[in-house]
Amino acid sequence: MESQQLHQNPRSLHGSAYASVTSKEVPSNQDPLAVSASNLPEFDRDSTKVNSQQETTPGTSAVPENHHHVSPQPASVPPPQNGQYQQHGMMTPNKAMASNWAHYQQPSMMTCSHYQTSPAYYQPDPHYPLPQYIPPLSTSSPDPIDSQNQHSEVPQAETKVRNNVLPPHTLTSEENFSTWVKFYIRFLKNSNLGDIIPNDQGEIKRQMTYEEHAYIYNTFQAFAPFHLLPTWVKQILEINYADILTVLCKSVSKMQTNNQELKDWIALANLEYDGSTSADTFEITVSTIIQRLKENNINVSDRLACQLILKGLSGDFKYLRNQYRTKTNMKLSQLFAEIQLIYDENKIMNLNKPSQYKQHSEYKNVSRTSPNTTNTKVTTRNYQRTNSSKPRAAKAHNIATSSKFSRVNNDHINESTVSSQYLSDDNELSLRPATERI
């Protein structure tokens, strides 16, 4: 009875029969891949049933004698070799064109082994979260600190730690492409591919290999969906779908233009003028900056330009701020004309200052040479000093002679006084003291 039921419903009881047989016949040290059907998850058993229903039921002669030991896992799908994701071969350009980039709509993990240089593409499983890191194409690290410690570490562990590179974010809109391409170029540089990226002049150091080209091709399409690319990028890829370097070269050129725009805005916001340079030079500088911004589709109004110029005026030009403070209709040409007028007036005044100073100095020299009392005395004193200058010995002789002569005269005067006094005594005359006589 049971044999008839088994013969009528072999598929419904295949799992239980397989479990009963394998539980008895499989030894304890069995291969971990040969798992019983009872231990498989439900979705695996469902997939096994679907595959068995699609295949044609073989005849009794084609069925092996011990058919319960056939592995339920399909032999065409190998087990995952690198973590959670199944390994696929690199998509060729023909397949990529035929699929219209449908294979690269989500970020992917592109890993390379320590001894393998060609990239491999991994399609993420929808049941697992997206990867957060992408190992670079080359395993060599430019960091000298890591190269010093490479002998003390295990090569496999070193590859896992050092070869993780943060991937760029996925492009979300056409307007964000200029920002996204900066992160993508940084990602390629961190992947040791900086020498094949065009520099600011559009030059590259070396030609890339096929593996490197495929790596750039795959990563670019993985993180930049085709429908979100700008029009100029689509035009390049329509001519040559794999010409990613041309896209990068033009992106670098556009980044330089954007940098120049930023520099022009900074220069315009930090304008300063005090008259040290000519007004014509200042006008040419400001007009060149405004014209360059206009060529990049950035229009600077006269009012904004006047406000930025007035903010940087100093010296004699500073009073123009008050003059333009109440004006609503500012004209850049009028402001330049007034700056030129003030500059010309200051220039004329500076030219007249040296002549006035020269006349004043000449007047001072004439007044010094004109005769006056002080200068006459000085001249006379100098003249006497020059004529009466005698040797020191002669001066001493003259002084001694004059003192001797004065001494002789004094003695003569004293003798006459004494004789007159004797005469007075002889006549018995009373004389008053000399003080009273006076």
From Swiss-Prot:
Feature: compositional bias, Polar residues: 1-11, 19-39, 49-60
A Gene Ontology biological process in which this protein takes part is:
viral translational frameshifting
Q: Map out region (Disordered) in residue numbers.
A: 1-88, 365-397, 419-438
Its function, per the record, reads: Capsid protein (CA) is the structural component of the virus-like particle (VLP), forming the shell that encapsulates the retrotransposons dimeric RNA genome. The particles are assembled from trimer-clustered units and there are holes in the capsid shells that allow for the diffusion of macromolecules. CA also has nucleocapsid-like chaperone activity, promoting primer tRNA(i)-Met annealing to the multipartite primer-binding site (PBS), dimerization of Ty2 RNA and initiation of reverse transcription.
Asked whether the UniProt record includes Cytoplasm among its keywords, one would answer yes
Report the subcellular localization: Cytoplasm
Subunit: Homotrimer.
Q: What else is known?
A: Retrotransposons are mobile genetic entities that are able to replicate via an RNA intermediate and a reverse transcription step. In contrast to retroviruses, retrotransposons are non-infectious, lack an envelope and remain intracellular. Ty2 retrotransposons belong to the copia elements (pseudoviridae).
Keyword annotations of the record: Cytoplasm, Transposable element
Record-marked site positions (Cleavage): H397, N398
* Region (RNA-binding) residue spans: 295-397
The protein's predominant localisation is cytoplasm
DNA damage is among the record's keywords: no
Q: Which InterPro entries match?
A: TYA
Q: Which domain of life is it from?
A: Eukaryota
Full protein name:
Transposon Ty2-C Gag polyprotein
Low complexity biased stretches: 369-382
| GO molecular function per UniProt | RNA binding
A single Gene Ontology CC term = cytoplasm
Q: Name one Pfam family in it.
A: TYA
Q: What is known of its domains?
A: The C-terminal RNA-binding region of CA is sufficient for all its nucleocapsid-like chaperone activities.
